[in-house]
Amino acid sequence: KMFYPQAKPNVIHEKMALFAKEKNACVITQNVDGLHSKAGTPQNDLVEFHGSLYRVFCQKCGRSIEWSKYLEDMHHEGCGGILRTDIVLYEEPIRREVLERAVEIVSNADLIVVCGTSLAVYPFAGLIEYASKDAKIVAVNKEKIPLPENAELIIGDAKEVFEEVDLKK
């Protein structure tokens, strides 16, 4: 079972959505669960690097289909084509426009917050290399991860760290 529409955003999703709405921030996520959207991150400030389970298209005609239709039948009732979720599967390439948008965001950021990733899987892990030398990089993770020398690493539970974040400061 891939779909959990009852899943709710946690404090990390909620604070990131607030950052996007109030602080001119963008979110680049590897998650395909749609929780950043559900938390209210504006779509123009969100890059779902590996796609979303909640976007479905027909592989034959290319039309977008409501995701709930995919749960009923894997075939497009219009043309008979096979439906597919808009996610990047293992060894598939990232869509060019997604990669370019992510690189643009990282290149122009003055603050980069890395959260909940090992930074071991490329091309996502390579995005950090596009950060400007003046950008502040802060990572929150339960264990040490490879980061540029100028980055600050907070080792701990990301939910606990984000609960302490105050956007008014």
Regions found by a protein language model. Name each.
Residues 1-169:
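Conserved catalytic alpha/beta core of Sir2/sirtuin-type deacylases, generalized to analogous enzyme cores
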